């Protein structure tokens, strides 16, 4: 936004990302699963382009990769994608929606709930019989651990 960009939210998944990017003239799209999509690459996923860009950033900044990653992780610690096998994903989504009704909810891709200092998304996978959970906080690792544990308690199921 600082440089004139406008964020566009898209549903996760290759086909959804490509369609959303084309419909909104998006330059770049990324998923927590480390998929990176580029308009100049026909809105396709590439793992090589991000590494070339990171290498360029390392050269320009003079920082090591561990420093660059450490800065980002300190600002926005996240759980990473946690997969759970559950018997009834619709029931889990409904229960989470009720439990976290006081947060700002969105249903673009599963259930996303945002609070002032943390947020989460839980959705049914497009490719596997699992639910995927991502949790993020603003600089608070303890809150991240507590909220991740709290959400997993509600989601239940088994590790996938």
Predicted regions and their residues:
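Phosphate-binding and adjacent anionic-ligand microenvironments
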Residues: 1-160
